[in-house]
């Protein structure tokens, strides 16, 4: 799957057994052996209240905070805007295979590919995360 692809799953079946629910899914990178590195963007704000939250990277290493912020209404693909402020957190990056995704039996909507500059900024932000697995940083 193309890096930067933005998908919407209804529902997304979580690896940890949490209750399935609709979720966005961004493909961040692909490995040679068919593994995708991806994030599950969320509208949940876990950035400390005293931190300045603006579009783009929010890194507060001393507090273990790493997030990338998309503002509501900003066009992220050629045809799509997130309806709410949306966050990608470094600690929530995980790996998946196409088999994992197909096994969910979910309705999957392809919303396009992130604009190249947004994908580059997102990856640069995540590479700064102290709470992301080192192998994931190498994949980015």
Residue ranges of each PLM-predicted region?
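Conserved functional hotspots at enzyme active or ligand-binding sites that engage polyanionic ligands
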Residues: 1-140
């Amino acid at each position: 799957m193309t890096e930067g692809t933005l998908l919407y799953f209804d529902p997304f079946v979580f690896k940890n057994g949490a209750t399935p629910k609709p979720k966005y899914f961004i493909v961040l990178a692909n490995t040679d052996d068919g593994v995708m590195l991806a994030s599950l963007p969320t509208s949940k704000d876990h950035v400390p209240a005293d931190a300045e939250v603006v579009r783009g990277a929010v890194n507060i290493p001393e507090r273990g905070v790493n997030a990338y912020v998309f503002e509501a209404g900003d066009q992220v693909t050629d045809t799509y805007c997130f309806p709410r402020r949306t966050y990608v957190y470094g600690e929530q990056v995980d790996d998946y295979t196409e088999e994992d995704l197909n096994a969910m039996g979910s309705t999957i909507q392809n919303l396009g590919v992130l604009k190249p500059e947004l994908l580059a900024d997102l990856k640069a932000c995540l590479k700064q995360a102290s709470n992301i697995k080192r192998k994931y940083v190498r994949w980015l």
